Amino acid sequence: MQTIKCVVVGDGAVGKTCLLISYTTNKFPSEYVPTVFDNYAVTVMIGGEPYTLGLFDTAGQEDYDRLRPLSYPQTDVFLVCFSVVSPSSFENVKEKWVPEITHHCQKTPFLLVGTQIDLRDETSTLEKLAKNKQKPITMEQGEKLAKELKAVKYVECSALTQKGLKNVFDEAILAALEPPEPTKKRKCKFL
């Protein structure tokens, strides 16, 4: 059975672990526990063939900047996550996350993933953002950044409601199996 390695990166508290737990167990975790490094595996059927989707959760906190890249070798696709209600996590996609993964894995495809879309219309969240003269990140802003950074595409979801959740992983699988440059093997390698 072929394995697809998918590594999830992004700032702390943007919902990476919830995304993975909600997808793999259909349950939403009730409390926040910062991740050091976790992995999950699910079997998916693609064109009648079984694949193992290996999902690697990483810690977004700066304390783990040197440890995190140890999970990158042999990655088939990255999910670069930000919260649509955290403009700073959106900025860090460009400032930190994409530079980090492209430094280690230049040719590995990645998706830009907007998380926590259920909070985009929540009154208390909008009030907190407004106090800092901020607004939620829009679908258009996500698509624009994805294009600018050469992501395979922009997708968004809610781990809480599961809206768009399956699509994130379907698109990740497609990106891993159908890389845009079919002549080159695009797994991440450390030299």
UniProtKB/Swiss-Prot annotation:
GO terms for molecular function: G protein activity; GTP binding. It is found in: Cell junction, Adherens junction; Cell membrane. It catalyses: GTP + H2O = GDP + phosphate + H(+). GTP binds at residues 10-17, 57-61, 115-118. Regulates mbt kinase activity and is also required to recruit mbt to adherens junctions. Together with mbt, regulates photoreceptor cell morphogenesis. The keyword Lipoprotein applies. Keywords: Cell junction, Cell membrane, Developmental protein, GTP-binding, Hydrolase, Lipoprotein, Membrane, Methylation, Nucleotide-binding, Prenylation. GO terms for biological process: ameboidal-type cell migration; anatomical structure morphogenesis; cellular process involved in reproduction in multicellular organism; developmental process involved in reproduction; epithelium development; hemocyte migration; maintenance of protein location; melanization defense response. This is Cdc42 homolog. Residues 189-191 form a propeptide. GO terms for cellular component: adherens junction; cytoplasm; plasma membrane. NCBIfam families: small_GTP. The gene is Cdc42. It is a lipid-anchor. A motif (Effector region) lies at residues 32-40. A lipid is attached at residue 188 (S-geranylgeranyl cysteine). SMART domains: RAB (SM00175), RAS (SM00173), RHO (SM00174). The modification Cysteine methyl ester is found at residue 188. Belongs to the small GTPase superfamily. Rho family. CDC42 subfamily.
